[in-house]
């Protein structure tokens, strides 16, 4: 039986990793989320980190957002170049899974060649 989860090595877990992507990553806005993308040091490594502030809503809303984003990233991960991504919500609405998957697949490669920092 295969595990249908995002493996631990595909996630940004430590504060230092998040800070690195926030400082060095290129900001890219999609309809539902804001992305910070930085090229990975290892060409085949694709990692995601998710940040959701308490302004977004109660805990069950924040957790649902994170579940949807993790699943969307898991589905598009094999088609992405090596990168580290921090994803945060835009607005207070829950993202649509299919639309989010398409946005991730389109926006992440767009942001990578322009690896210089930019403001959101």
Curated annotation (Swiss-Prot):
SUPFAM superfamilies: Ribosomal protein S5 domain 2-like. GO terms for molecular function: 3'-tRNA processing endoribonuclease activity; ribonuclease P activity; tRNA binding. Pfam families: Ribonuclease_P. It comes from the Bacteria. It is an enzyme of class 3 (hydrolase). Keywords: Endonuclease, Hydrolase, Nuclease, RNA-binding, tRNA processing. GO terms for biological process: tRNA 3'-end processing; tRNA 5'-leader removal. Its EC number is 3.1.26.5. It catalyses: Endonucleolytic cleavage of RNA, removing 5'-extranucleotides from tRNA precursor. One of its GO terms (cellular component) is ribonuclease P complex. PROSITE patterns: RIBONUCLEASE_P. RNaseP catalyzes the removal of the 5'-leader sequence from pre-tRNA to produce the mature 5'-terminus. It can also cleave other RNA substrates such as 4.5S RNA. The protein component plays an auxiliary but essential role in vivo by binding to the 5'-leader sequence and broadening the substrate specificity of the ribozyme. Belongs to the RnpA family. Consists of a catalytic RNA component (M1 or rnpB) and a protein subunit. This is Ribonuclease P protein component. It comes from Chlamydia trachomatis serovar D (strain ATCC VR-885 / DSM 19411 / UW-3/Cx).
């Amino acid at each position: 039986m295969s595990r249908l989860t995002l493996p631990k090595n595909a996630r940004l877990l430590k504060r230092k990793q998040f800070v690195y992507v926030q400082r060095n990553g290129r900001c890219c806005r999609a309809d539902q989320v804001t992305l910070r993308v930085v090229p990975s040091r290892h060409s085949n490594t694709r990692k995601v980190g998710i940040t959701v502030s308490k302004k977004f809503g109660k805990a069950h809303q924040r957790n649902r957002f994170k579940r949807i984003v993790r699943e969307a990233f898991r589905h598009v991960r094999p088609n992405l170049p090596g990168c580290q991504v921090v994803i945060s919500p835009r607005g207070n609405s829950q993202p649509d899974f299919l639309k989010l998957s398409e946005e991730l697949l389109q926006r992440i490669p767009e942001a990578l060649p322009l690896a210089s920092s930019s403001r959101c």
